[in-house]
């Protein structure tokens, strides 16, 4: 296993497999990359990269986008990652989940993280920029994913005045319970489109803690291997709180890097710099790829620190 100069291990890799999306969420951070990247990595490329990162001790690989289910070969991407023995998950808005779910399950997908934010179709439309009817299609996809045995986690970005009241939280917990899903609340990030709405919609994650207790929730530990996320349990539903803004504790527990759709390795979603892995991937140059990964890791800096020399 590799460690950066702050002692943080590299355990997880996020694959940003495309930059197209069929939604227009008001806060989209684009996974820290610019739009319209150019040529994409192939399904076979992802298999190669996964095998190399696994040799470094990385075991957890997450597919994201854009909207990854827009890729016509998404099942092949999952299959090429999974055949290495890696644990593979996928983040999606869920609209196309029903179309793909059986192929994804057969390919080896272990879990789908579905961004849903609210159980109110009108609010859902306001957040995502799609018709309210899309919400029902997402629910159908979630139900089918549950039925074929794919583990589920619901994502909800915390948005002031939209989903920060008691009823909104309660309804999301209820939905998660009906699906046997976990639920995670994510602080709004001042990145991508999120920067333009940050002052209007940002609500500290701590606001939800009081609501969680009101709903009978209890502390259930901390995910030290992933951003030191606090966990709660509400009537059997695991709830994670992701405080990613101005939080050194979050950064100190970060064990993740991300590979953009055009083959650039980013050490932090907030960072502009990256290391280009594409030449080594396309030439199947294992030693070159290992060197490039170590170079990126040596440059890795937490976005938020307890102490700064600047």
Swiss-Prot record:
Pfam families, per the entry: Mob_synth_C, Radical_SAM
Pathway: Cofactor biosynthesis; molybdopterin biosynthesis
UniProt-recorded Gene Ontology molecular function terms: 4 iron, 4 sulfur cluster binding; cyclic pyranopterin monophosphate synthase activity; GTP 3',8'-cyclase activity; GTP binding; metal ion binding; S-adenosyl-L-methionine binding
Catalytic activity: GTP + AH2 + S-adenosyl-L-methionine = (8S)-3',8-cyclo-7,8-dihydroguanosine 5'-triphosphate + 5'-deoxyadenosine + L-methionine + A + H(+)
Binding site for [4Fe-4S] cluster 1: 21, 25, 28
Organism domain of life: Archaea
Binding site for GTP: 14, 62, 91, 153
Domain Radical SAM core: residue ranges: 5-218
Cited NCBIfam families: moaA_archaeal, PRK00164.2-1
Role noted for this protein: Catalyzes the cyclization of GTP to (8S)-3',8-cyclo-7,8-dihydroguanosine 5'-triphosphate.
Protein name according to UniProt: Probable GTP 3',8-cyclase
Organism: Pyrobaculum aerophilum (strain ATCC 51768 / DSM 7523 / JCM 9630 / CIP 104966 / NBRC 100827 / IM2)
Gene expressing this chain: moaA
């Amino acid at each position: 296993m590799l460690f950066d100069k702050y002692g943080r291990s590299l355990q997880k890799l996020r694959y940003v497999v495309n930059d197209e999306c069929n939604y227009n969420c008001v806060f989209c951070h684009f996974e820290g990359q610019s739009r319209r990247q150019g040529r994409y990595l192939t399904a076979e490329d992802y298999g190669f990269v996964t095998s190399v990162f696994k040799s470094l001790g990385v075991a957890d690989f997450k597919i994201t986008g854009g909207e990854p289910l827009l890729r016509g070969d998404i099942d092949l991407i999952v299959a090429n990652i999974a055949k290495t023995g890696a644990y593979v998950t996928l983040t999606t808005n869920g609209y196309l989940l029903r179309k793909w779910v059986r192929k994804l399950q057969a390919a080896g997908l272990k879990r789908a993280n579905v961004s849903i934010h609210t159980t109110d179709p009108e609010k859902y439309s306001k957040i995502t920029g799609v018709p309210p009817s899309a919400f029902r299609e997402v629910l159908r996809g979630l139900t089918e994913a549950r039925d074929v045995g794919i583990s589920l986690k619901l994502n909800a970005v915390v948005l002031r005045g939209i989903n920060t009241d008691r009823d909104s939280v309660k309804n999301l917990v209820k939905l998660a319970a009906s699906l046997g899903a976990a639920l995670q609340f994510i602080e709004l990030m001042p990145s991508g489109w999120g920067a333009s709405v940050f002052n209007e919609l940002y609500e500290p994650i701590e606001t939800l803690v009081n609501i969680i207790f009101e709903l009978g929730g209890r502390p259930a530990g901390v995910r030290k291997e992933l951003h030191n996320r606090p966990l709660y349990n509400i009537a059997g539903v695991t709830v994670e709180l992701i405080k990613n803004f101005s939080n050194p504790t979050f950064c100190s527990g970060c064990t993740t890097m991300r590979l953009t759709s055009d083959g650039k390795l980013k050490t932090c979603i907030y960072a502009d710099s990256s290391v280009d892995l594409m030449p080594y991937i396309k030439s199947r140059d294992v030693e070159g790829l290992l060197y490039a990964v170590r170079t990126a890791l040596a440059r890795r800096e937490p976005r938020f620190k307890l102490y700064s020399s600047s």
